[in-house]
Amino acid sequence: QGGVELLIDALKTAGGGTWFRVAERQGLDHLVRERQIIRSGREEVAKALGEDPQNLGPMLFAGMIIEGGIIGYDTNIKTGGRGARLLGIGKSKRYQQDVVTVSIRAVSVLTGEVLLNVQAKKTILSYGGAGDIFRFVDNATTLVEYEDGVGNNESVTYAVRTAIEAAVLELVYQGHDRGYWTIKEEENE
């Protein structure tokens, strides 16, 4: 869930917002229903005024559909840590790496052919540290135990967004290399 919204944002911001024209398809049912309401309202007003109804312009169509999804989330790809304890006083650190993988493909609307297909991965890093004390005091009759720690986890949403943006960029490069589109160079002034 949410991958479509991140893909739309990546497409709309690629090349400063000039590389892709994105047509709404995720909420197409809502869009079509709203257009029917507008059309019906215009027909009623025009009929009451004895005029022809004002037409609603055509929807934007796509020559290419870009779709895909999150195809993998692998946990504990790499884990580790270290620690030491002396006379009941210790310190430790740990880390873990997960990987999210996304796949995006460009499909020709005219032929149904998959023109381009790319995958991108992003590592998600988690790490933490802790310190502790475990000691008997007062002639070994009282136990003192203290632990403290902190952990940091990279945002999974950020990782998915980064992987999608990398996949869109790779899609642009592959499409350019295969002649599906050209990238207009900005003029130096």
Regions inferred by a protein language model and the residue ranges of each:
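N-terminal segment of the mature soluble domain
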Residues: 1-76, 99-117
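Mixed-charge, low-complexity intrinsically disordered segments
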Residues: 37-47, 77-97, 131-148
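Glycine-centered flexibility motif
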Residues: 57, 88-90, 179
